[in-house]
Structures are given as C-alpha cells and as structure tokens.
Design a protein with these regions (language model features):
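Terminal-region recognition feature
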Residues: 1-121, 128-212
C-alpha cells in the first residue's frame, strides 16, 4: 500500500468517524428512552440541541430549535394516546420563536399530564416550551433562561434599551425600525407566556412572570 493510499484511507476514516459516533449515540439514546417509557408508562420525546461533531471531518455543528423540530415534536404529540403522560427531555439553547411557540402550544393543548425534564439548560425558546408543561423537573444545577426574542444577532431587549437611553434625534432610522420590531416581538412573547400560564395561576401573577 502506497503512501497516497494510506493518506486516502486516513481521510475516509476521519470523514466517517463522526457519522459512526452519531449513530452509536442515537442508538444509546433510544435504549435509554425506551427504558424511561417502560418505567414511567409514558411517551418520551427528546428535544436535544448540543454541539456535536457529526459533519465532515468532525467540525462542530450547532443546532437550535427550528421548524423541522416543531413538525417532528407536534407529530409525535398528535400520535400519542391522549391518556398517556408525556415526558419531554429538553436540552436546548433556544432557537426560532415561531417553532418554539408552536411546540409550546401543542404541549399546552395536550390533554394528558406533561412533564418537562431539564438536565442541563433550556434557554430562550426552550424556557417557553418548559412553561407550557404541567410540571418542570430540573437537576440541581440546571438553568432556565429569559424568553426575550432575538432580532438577527441583537437581543430585542438590548435594542429597546438603546432607544430608551438616547434622544430620538440621535438614533438612525434602521435602529428605530429595529426597535419597533423588538417591541412587537417582545409583546408577542409576553402575551404567549401569559397564555401558557393563565390556567396555572391567576392573571396578575402570570403577567408578573411574563414581564421577568
């Protein structure tokens, strides 16, 4: 075998190794999922977004909540017996507001008991999804995060803060437009949180939580 053949073999093994590792990880997750379902007599849905080296040559791939996730989770919920408890394992940095809101509303409308498990973190849209559940179970050091929306690379709350601190005459048109979008997005999220919480607490308390 020549040096060129060895280099080619090394390249091929390096390329497929992340794929093999990902398949093994998925198989392991499926075994754990099945065991939890048997022990709790429930339907378990995983919504896990963590940095995993699963593309060519093992470069990190970051995942967030997207429309594909909402389609898969909502389909799984609709295919579950309404009498069966629903357990959702949530580990995500957040993602697309529309997708997270769709999942949250589907969970909120589910007639059976829904429990969300947060082993490490559920930020932004992940927190929105968690708030839709009947019960949230977290590990001792797990965290939830604020549900403030993002406008591209900018947090909506930060855009609004800039507008509050500067005179309107000193703010360019683009920033004013962003501020208007940020205000609308923030109001939408606040109303959505109230909608998800109003059957779990009184209206005033729901408004207070939504404003956090």
């Amino acid at each position: 075998m020549s040096m060129l053949d060895l280099l080619w073999l090394f390249f091929m093994l390096t390329a497929i190794q992340p794929v093999v590792r990902q398949k093994l990880l998925e198989t392991s997750r499926q075994r754990v999922l099945s065991r939890i379902e048997r022990e709790r007599n429930s339907r378990v849905i995983l919504l896990i977004h963590r940095q995993e080296t699963m593309n060519l040559l093992g470069f990190p791939l970051f995942r967030y909540i997207d429309i594909d996730d909402s389609e898969e989770v909502i389909r799984a919920i609709h295919m579950t017996d309404p009498q069966l408890p629903l357990d959702i394992v949530l580990h995500t940095p957040g993602g697309l507001v529309l997708a997270a809101l769709q999942i949250a509303r589907a969970i909120h409308a589910y007639p059976g008991k829904v429990t969300v498990f947060v082993p490490h973190y559920a930020m932004s849209g992940g927190t929105l999804i968690a708030l839709a559940a009947d019960e949230i179970v977290m590990s001792p050091h797990a965290v939830l995060g604020p549900v403030d929306p993002q406008l591209g690379q900018y947090p909506a709350a930060s855009v609004l803060k800039v507008v509050e601190q500067k005179p309107v005459a000193d703010i360019d048109d683009q920033t004013l437009i962003l501020a208007d979008l940020a205000r609308k997005a923030t109001d939408q999220i606040r109303r959505s949180v109230v909608e998800l919480l109003k059957d779990k607490m009184d209206a005033d308390r729901a408004e207070q939580v939504a404003a956090m």
